[in-house]
Curated annotation (Swiss-Prot):
A molecular function (GO) term: structural constituent of ribosome
Organism domain of life: Bacteria
Designated name of the protein: Small ribosomal subunit protein uS7
GO biological process: translation
PROSITE patterns in the cross-refs: RIBOSOMAL_S7
Gene name per UniProt: rpsG
UniProt subunit comment: Part of the 30S ribosomal subunit. Contacts proteins S9 and S11.
InterPro entries cross-referenced by the UniProt entry: Ribosomal_uS7, Ribosomal_uS7_bac/org-type, Ribosomal_uS7_CS, Ribosomal_uS7_dom, Ribosomal_uS7_dom_sf
Pfam families: Ribosomal_S7
UniProtKB keywords: Ribonucleoprotein, Ribosomal protein, RNA-binding, rRNA-binding, tRNA-binding
Function text: One of the primary rRNA binding proteins, it binds directly to 16S rRNA where it nucleates assembly of the head domain of the 30S subunit. Is located at the subunit interface close to the decoding center, probably blocks exit of the E-site tRNA.
Sequence similarity: Belongs to the universal ribosomal protein uS7 family.
Species the sequence originates in: Methylobacillus flagellatus (strain ATCC 51484 / DSM 6875 / VKM B-1610 / KT)
GO cellular component, as recorded: small ribosomal subunit
Keyword Cell division: no
């Protein structure tokens, strides 16, 4: 790692439709190849689907899903005396949200529905209810940290 000055955090503008910074960040996570308008169309379409299917406010479902997906602990590899140990470490708040959004996107991409909007809507609804592939991923990470609790004294 370079020992230069710390890079300042970029200020992400809130999303124009919902006025939420979290939605804006998720659009950026969803975006591929710099096509932001396509990512926005997909997300807003998913939000419309959520409102139709669940009858709840789409933004509420989204924030609940993200908060359900945030991991508390994760494991990091650390080399000690010729052996690699999976050391459980607490996740920083900014990274919690970033991981939750990435897991949500990846889980939605792996689903079987026809369009990405439908996949994302279904995954968001499931995550807000505490089930689905993204929740499974978070549980798996927590399980790994629990299993390697014995190595927690190898702090970073």
């Amino acid at each position: 790692m370079p020992r230069r000055r710390e890079v300042p955090k970029r200020n992400i503008l809130p999303d124009p439709k919902f006025g939420s910074q979290e939605v804006s960040k998720f659009v950026n996570v969803l975006m591929t190849g710099g096509k932001k308008s396509v990512a926005e169309r997909i997300l807003y379409g998913a939000f419309d689907q959520i409102t139709q299917k669940s009858g709840k406010e789409a933004l509420e479902v989204f924030t609940l899903a993200i908060s359900n997906l945030r991991p508390v602990v994760e494991v990091k590899s650390r080399r000690v005396g010729g052996a690699n140990y999976q050391v459980p470490v607490e996740v920083r708040p900014a990274r919690r949200s970033a991981l939750a959004m990435r897991w949500l996107r990846d889980a939605a991409r792996k689903r079987g529905e026809k369009s990405m909007g439908l996949r994302l809507a279904a995954e968001l609804i499931e995550a807000s209810e505490g089930r689905g592939a993204a929740i499974k991923k978070r549980e798996e990470v927590h399980r790994m940290a629990e299993a390697n609790k014995a190595f927690s004294h190898f702090r970073f």
